[in-house]
Regions:
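Active-site-proximal, structured, solvent-exposed surfaces of multi-pass membrane proteins
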Residues: 14, 53-56, 545-666
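Conserved luminal/periplasmic juxtamembrane motif of membrane-embedded glycan-processing enzymes
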Residues: 2-578, 583-591, 668-670, 675
Length: 675
């Protein structure tokens, strides 16, 4: 087969004749692909999408106000800094229309569809910068944005959204190299910021590593310009981190306080098993479609099907196309690393802090998925160029779309559940509402999080049920210590203000007659010098008798008759009226966290740790009222950085001009196909 000639100037004009035709066709196909889960009353989200993302986003949407954001919620983990958790997706721009309109289970499905559209459009723009045939680029877009990775991770909304933004990161880099360095480097910073704000740190790390691999493919082919490439990537990364500071700064504080902060144990699951690669050609190989799941750690992680034509087309593209390098670099190193210790590269990669933090390496498969889509498009272009049958491109792209439409949507239980949200959670939510009504005011409900059936796992947010648990949340370490000790020392329930609890032995909900008030004065106070000492003391602590106070603190002469005579409260504040005849410790049974402030008549009172995980203040003698308020210490800093950097990047996008040193010649060569 002869090598096709480079396109003539007239051909380029023809290619640009209808620039919106392909994106419009892609949008129509995505709507068709998601039509059933978006509109059917017998389809719903499932897994973490229903249990975690929906309750968090609904909580945020219900409380959205320009003057007040729900930085703190009292309903999970005895108080929790909700907006510090990246999974909420509060600052991810594509989520904003849904948050403003009001979140329902259907809203989450619409978010998935929108992100799938972004994934397809980004892949199309990237691939079309390397191949001339628009139908080949559309085929590649379907092979990525509608691939098995997205079907298998439909319940992981943050990861899904971040993977959807990944092609746009590469598009920004490609255009920074080829067209306007300043404009598109700044655009890449904005895209990278959105990718981070999607809420998946693992996907963000993988994406920037993928960007590095894509750029390395450029250098490998040209063997020049590496300093320029590194500078562009560096500025894109810096811009992304700065734009995402509104989320990263509070999240860094939460991670530091987290029970997982000191966990450096090696990854023991989430590696790529070679047998799972069979799902590239046989979607039900692991039983994901039929329901007989045999995957090592669940079928969703190991479901890769992107169409029966993708693998042969990708092999054709790798052999025959002159644009094989970007695709191969996106496939080979990531897959090698995902194999884990068995592959060898994992040991080298684990030396890097970013890679070490990856929970499940196989969740970086979207890099390989884009590489396969890239090579499949290149292979398709080679075939279309050689076999000049007019309808062949439309036929092949259409066959691939119908293929993935069935296997990754209509017939795939990983993509959505075939039941309404009410059918899944309605009865348990009703039971939860009934229990929430019975809960005495200003007391908490305690149960092992995985043993409660009251709706989605984060049902306390929707039920407004103050609870000690919170599934799938990054919990502060001292609070986790307290809950662990409470399993061995039930008296700690009293100090945590637990009024009712699930009796695991009987399966019934019991009353706790000895519950202590939300705000009270302990009978006695004992100093502890370290968190390790207070953690050990929890094993025998009786909060009704005494409380532990972390040193240093102001002098205490505990008044045994001091009393908290009235408590007013909101979701992010408390007002406690008290009487004491000497400086005494007032304990507030709320999880300690940076950002809580207390003041008395406008004078600040230091917040101190009480009973290892809770908080309190030392109040002066008298008859006064103490005000407790939560204000995130880090949000203001992050907001200022994000606004300033975002403004600078937007200005750079607007004023950046095309470079006089664009490498058009290189890309005319890269678009060619070789015999």
């Amino acid at each position: 087969m002869k090598e096709p000639a480079a396109p003539a100037p007239g051909a380029a004009a023809s290619h640009r004749k209808n620039p919106l035709a392909a994106p419009a066709a892609i949008a129509a196909c995505v709507i068709v692909f998601y039509w059933v889960p978006m509109t059917s009353p017998s389809a719903s989200i499932q897994g973490d999408a229903a249990d975690v993302h929906y309750p968090m986003q609904k909580y945020l949407s219900d409380r959205f106000s320009p003057r007040q954001f729900p930085f703190w919620t009292p309903y999970v983990l005895s108080g929790y800094p909700l907006l510090a958790n990246p999974k909420v997706g509060a600052w991810y721009p594509p989520n904003w229309p849904f948050l403003l309109a009001g979140i329902t289970p259907r809203s989450i499905q619409l978010e998935l569809a929108l992100n799938a559209l972004l994934a397809c459009l980004g892949a199309y723009l990237l691939i079309s910068s390397h191949v001339e045939n628009r139908m080949a680029a559309m085929l590649g877009a379907f092979a990525y944005g509608l691939s098995g990775f997205f079907a298998g991770h439909a319940s992981q909304v943050s990861l899904f959204a971040a993977a959807a933004m990944f092609p746009w990161l590469l598009v920004a880099y490609r255009r920074a190299i080829d067209i306007a360095p300043v404009r598109y480097t700044a655009f890449g910073g904005l895209v990278g910021g959105a990718l981070i704000l999607a809420g998946s740190g693992q996907a963000a790390v993988s994406s920037f590593l993928g960007l590095g691999l894509y750029a390395f493919a450029d250098w490998w082919r040209e063997r020049q310009g590496w300093l320029r490439d590194v500078a562009i990537i560096g500025f894109m990364l810096a811009g992304a981190l700065a734009c995402a500071a509104i989320q990263l700064v509070p999240a860094q504080e939460l991670a530091r306080e987290s029970s997982h902060a000191a966990d450096s144990s090696p990854i023991v699951e989430g590696f790529l098993h070679p047998g799972s690669l069979m799902t590239l050609v046989a979607p039900d190989w692991l039983g994901a479609i039929s329901g007989g799941i045999q995957a090592p750690s669940g079928a969703a992680q190991f479901y890769f099907y992107a169409g029966l034509l993708v693998l042969p087309l990708a092999l054709m593209g790798a052999v025959k196309s002159g644009v094989r390098l970007p695709g191969l670099f996106l496939i080979v190193p990531p897959v090698w690393y995902m194999l884990g210790p068995a592959g060898g590269l994992y040991y080298l990669g684990s030396l890097a802090p970013g890679l070490r933090s990856l929970h499940a390496p196989v969740e970086g498969w979207f890099l390989a998925a884009l590489g396969l889509a890239f090579l499949a498009a290149a292979g398709a272009e080679w075939i279309f160029a050689g076999w000049r049958f007019p309808f062949l491109p439309v036929l092949v792209a259409g066959l691939l779309f119908v293929d993935v439409w069935y296997w990754n949507s209509l017939g795939n239980p990983l993509a959505y559940v075939r039941a309404s949200f009410d059918e899944l959670y309605g009865s348990s939510e009703e039971a939860g509402r009934a229990e929430a009504i019975k809960q005495p005011q200003l007391t908490r409900f305690h149960a092992p999080a995985n043993r409660v059936s009251m709706g989605p796992k984060l049902h306390p947010l929707d039920l407004k049920l103050e609870a000690t648990y919170g599934a799938s949340l990054l919990d502060p370490g001292p609070y986790r210590d307290y809950l662990d000790a409470m399993e061995r020392n039930p008296k700690l329930r009293d100090g945590l203000n637990v009024g009712r609890f699930l009796n695991v032995a009987t399966g019934r909900i019991d009353e706790n007659a000895s519950v202590l008030a939300r705000a009270y004065f302990p009978k006695a106070v004992v100093d502890v010098r370290s968190l390790a000492e207070s953690r050990q003391a929890l094993e025998t602590l009786d909060p009704a008798v005494k409380s532990l106070v972390l040193w240093p603190h102001a002098p205490i002469r505990q008044d045994p008759d001091a009393a908290a005579m009235g408590v007013r409260y909101g979701e992010q504040w408390y007002r406690v009226h008290y009487h004491a005849v000497s400086p005494s410790l007032l304990k507030l049974s709320v999880a300690w966290y940076p950002g809580w402030h207390a003041d008395l008549d406008g004078q600040p009172l230091p917040i101190i740790r009480v009973d290892h995980a809770l908080m309190g203040v030392i109040v002066p003698a008298g008859d006064n009222e103490v005000a407790f308020n939560f204000h995130s210490k880090r949000f203001g800093t992050g907001l200022a950085i994000s606004l300033a950097s975002g403004l600078v990047l937007v200005m750079c996008v607007r004023v950046g001009r095309p470079s006089h040193h664009r490498k058009r010649k290189k890309h005319r060569h890269s678009r060619r196909v070789t015999a």
